[in-house]
């Protein structure tokens, strides 16, 4: 059995990894792991005023803060029965267009395109595609300018408030945005032609279900009051849990979603599959020109879908501004005296369906539930990677699995910061520690480091295990007191794996053994690990990636007590494994 891992996914937002486990000729498991620390926004918002909640919730992520702002505003206004003015509605949609342009242009050109034109990154790609790199940057700046002008800042803007805005853009600012959008259109055409014309890999291909907001009135758009499924079903906003059915997996901070026990996808491709025929103008013509049924079965077509949405956004901006400027006067923000209520806000973030549900009791927030696009996509990400890995293995191309899985993950453009906010990890991921330890020691001789306090019962298990390993002749065993000034151990070219031996509270039965990557332990706040963070600061990044924790669940860490019998048995199990 072997594992092919991408420990750090490049060209995505946040800290995640993907791994495939291979047993003979079968890919037995694929894990899309999210190591990003949890945001805890849903808990931090409790007891706050609605105004504080509207300011706090978007801070779950700086990449798509406008989407979160619009989602929490829609939820709170539904909860408090606030009816938005037309002016405010138009300006919220305008800043939403800015975010889509900024996010999509950055992703398709800088993060995705190198995968399909043979370059490792956008900097290297600039030698052959200088125009594309430059125009992507200009489109990104334009999107940022819209968000800053309308919402006060392009990251975590505070101008959007319950019932409207603190202030509205001037006529001059809006006229400039409109003229600039029109000037961009020739380059937007080039973008659509480029990404719709790329030769995308046919691997993997599989049907899935797509979900997105239903804008209503047979329109294309980025928000609504119900959820449209590619099956033809429609789910009202307040019944969103009938779609998401969230659950937790042990290898990730993010919750997962399944509909009727099956994975589903959200994002640009979901919107184009479900709503693409509603596109009008030039975006509609380009959709008719390029869209085929094969888009539905291949996640790589998220990228041409994003290109079409960039065109839609550039066409929509002049329409929004023209309608706004025809309104005679700017209406002030709408106020309310409602103190208790519950509401759901549905919007499309660039990465897909974003759901905010907020409840207010006696003027204070009493419940918050946020469902992000990447959390919904995670199951399909694993499924598509599993399909691709198996097909490549069957074709005798195992060497291509790692790179292909990484490209698939990037096609979904996961926003890992958003997705990591909600899962409360009460149990460390359970692993087959014997197999993991065997695989490691078979290839290299690791350095073992015993960590702990021998005077505090089971907290001394790491030190005792290290002592017994030394006694039976296992080489290169150290104690924590020996490592901080060990220059050979921490030198830059150190390549050997390091295994820390320690008591690890992962909410299991006493004596339970687990074997985990050190990075996962450091980022998991539900695990006890006192010395490891300071030790990791001494490591370079390759060492950190090549370090592990062999943890034993303690029964007690009371001072003055001896090791418990279950922990002593665990020590013997490890000794027997290494001695063999």
Language-model features: locations:
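A translation/RNA-centric and nucleic-acid-associated enzymatic feature enriched
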Residues: 356, 361, 367
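N-terminal catalytic or cofactor-binding beta/alpha core of small enzyme domains
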Residues: 432-555, 561-580
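Short small-residue beta-strand/loop micro-motif enriched in glycine and branched aliphatics
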Residues: 53, 366-368, 558
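A short interface-forming secondary-structure element
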Residues: 370-372
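Active-site bordering "gate/hinge" segments
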Residues: 1-351, 361, 374-432
């Amino acid at each position: 059995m072997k594992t092919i891992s991408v420990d750090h996914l490049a060209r995505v937002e946040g800290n995640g990894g993907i791994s495939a486990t291979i047993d003979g000729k079968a890919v037995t498991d694929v894990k899309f792991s999210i190591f990003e620390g949890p945001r805890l926004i849903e808990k931090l918002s409790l007891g706050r005023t609605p105004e504080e909640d509207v300011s706090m919730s978007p801070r779950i992520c700086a990449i798509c803060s406008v989407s979160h702002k619009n989602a929490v505003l829609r939820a709170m206004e539904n909860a408090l029965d606030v009816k938005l003015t037309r002016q405010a509605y138009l300006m919220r949609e305008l800043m939403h267009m800015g975010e889509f342009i900024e996010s999509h242009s950055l992703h398709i050109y800088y993060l995705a395109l190198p995968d399909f034109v043979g370059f490792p990154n956008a900097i290297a790609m600039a030698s052959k595609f200088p125009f594309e790199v430059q125009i992507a940057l200009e489109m990104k700046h334009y999107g940022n300018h819209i968000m800053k002008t309308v919402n006060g800042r392009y990251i975590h803007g505070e101008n959007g408030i319950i019932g409207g805005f603190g202030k509205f853009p001037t006529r001059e600012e809006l006229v400039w945005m409109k003229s600039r959008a029109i000037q961009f259109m020739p380059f937007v055409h080039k973008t659509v032609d480029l990404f719709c014309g790329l030769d995308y890999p046919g691997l993997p291909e599989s049907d899935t279900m797509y979900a997105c907001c239903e804008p209503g009135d047979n329109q294309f758009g980025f928000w609504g009051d119900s959820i449209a499924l590619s099956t033809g079903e429609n789910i009202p906003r307040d019944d969103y849990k009938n779609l998401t059915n969230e659950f937790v997996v042990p290898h990730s901070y993010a919750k997962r979603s399944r509909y009727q026990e099956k994975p589903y996808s959200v994002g640009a491709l979901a919107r184009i599959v479900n709503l693409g025929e509603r596109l009008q103008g030039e975006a509609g013509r380009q959709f008719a020109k390029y869209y085929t049924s094969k888009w539905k079965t291949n996640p790589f077509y998220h990228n041409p879908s994003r290109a079409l949405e960039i065109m839609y956004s550039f066409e929509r901006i002049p329409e929004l501004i023209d309608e706004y400027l025809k309104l005679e006067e700017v209406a002030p923000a709408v106020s309310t005296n409602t103190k208790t209520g519950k509401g759901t806000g549905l919007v499309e973030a660039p990465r897909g369906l974003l759901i905010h549900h907020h409840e207010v009791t006696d003027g204070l927030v009493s419940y918050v539930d946020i469902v992000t696009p990447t959390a919904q996509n995670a199951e399909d990400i694993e499924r598509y990677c599993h399909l691709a890995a198996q097909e490549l293995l069957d074709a005798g191309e195992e060497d291509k699995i790692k790179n292909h899985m990484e490209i698939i993950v990037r096609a979904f453009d996961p926003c890992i910061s958003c997705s990591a906010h909600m899962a409360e990890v009460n149990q460390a991921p359970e692993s087959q520690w014997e197999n993991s330890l065997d695989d490691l020691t078979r290839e290299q001789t690791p350095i073992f480091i015993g960590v702990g306090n021998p005077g505090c019962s089971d907290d001394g298990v790491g030190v005792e295990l290290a002592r017994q390993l030394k006694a039976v002749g296992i080489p290169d065993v150290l104690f924590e007191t020996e490592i901080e000034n060990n220059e050979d151990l921490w030198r830059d070219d150190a390549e050997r794996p390091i295994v820390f031996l320690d008591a690890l509270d992962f909410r299991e039965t006493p004596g339970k053994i687990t074997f985990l990557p050190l990075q996962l332990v450091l980022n998991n706040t539900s695990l006890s690990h006192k010395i490891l963070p300071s030790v990791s600061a001494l490591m370079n990044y390759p060492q950190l990636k090549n370090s592990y924790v062999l943890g034993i669940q303690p029964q007690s860490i009371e001072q003055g007590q001896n090791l418990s019998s279950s922990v002593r048995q665990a020590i013997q199990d490890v000794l027997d494994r290494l001695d063999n």
